[in-house]
Amino acid sequence: MDYQNNVSEERVAEMIWDAVSEGATLKDVHGIPQDMMDGLYAHAYEFYNQGRLDEAETFFRFLCIYDFYNPDYTMGLAAVCQLKKQFQKACDLYAVAFTLLKNDYRPVFFTGQCQLLMRKAAKARQCFELVNERTEDESLRAKALVYLEALKTAETEQHSEQEKE
């Protein structure tokens, strides 16, 4: 009997792998309805807003695993990582979200913030410049310009200090 269970488990695993390889999500494979995913997202978002980051991370991680094509889930997990000061992980997740979102430059903007917090001003500048040049979201462009201006001011002050020495 154990041999049959083992064979059937292997076959199920193989079928799941085949489905995922062809673009299906685990949500689809397991037949999880979208309204359940939406409910889980609502809980994750609520935990995030309450500052309960460990709980939010657990929910967003589950959502990402079960539907890796939904950029909202990836953005949520990235935002949690950013608040937990896991900046490189947040940058990696924002990169995934950007590939899913195509012309939405919010992930690039948030990556710029993370780069600044990792003290990588040149990379941060590249992110904010890209947002400034390419986004159609005027509000996001304005925020990027504020960061670019602050970086410029900081550079000017740094050069002034170096000249005094």
Curated annotation (Swiss-Prot):
Any Pfam family: TPR_3
Alphabetized UniProt keyword annotations: Activator, Chaperone, Cytoplasm, Transcription, Transcription regulation, Virulence
Gene3D superfamilies assigned: Tetratricopeptide repeat domain
Keyword Calcium among UniProt keywords: no
Compartments where found: Cytoplasm
GO cellular component, one term: cytoplasm
Gene Ontology MF annotations: identical protein binding
Signal peptide positions (record): none
InterPro entries associated with the record: T3SS_Ca_resp_chp_LcrH/SycD (IPR005415), T3SS_Ca_resp_chp_LcrH/SycD_sub (IPR016379), TPR-3 (IPR011716), TPR-like_helical_dom_sf (IPR011990)
SUPFAM superfamilies for the chain: TPR-like
Membership in a protein family: Belongs to the LcrH/SycD chaperone family.
Summary of the function given for this chain in its UniProt record: Type III secretion-associated chaperone required for SipB and SipC stabilization. Prevents premature association of SipB with SipC, which may lead to their targeting for degradation. Along with InvF, required for transcription activation of sigDE (sopB pipC), sicAsipBCDA, and sopE.
NCBIfam families: LcrH_SycD (TIGR02552), PRK15331.1 (NF011859)
Subunit annotation: Dimer or higher-order oligomers.
Protein name stated in the entry: Chaperone protein SicA
Organism: Salmonella typhimurium (strain LT2 / SGSC1412 / ATCC 700720)
Lineage, opening ranks: Bacteria, Pseudomonadati, Pseudomonadota, Gammaproteobacteria, Enterobacterales
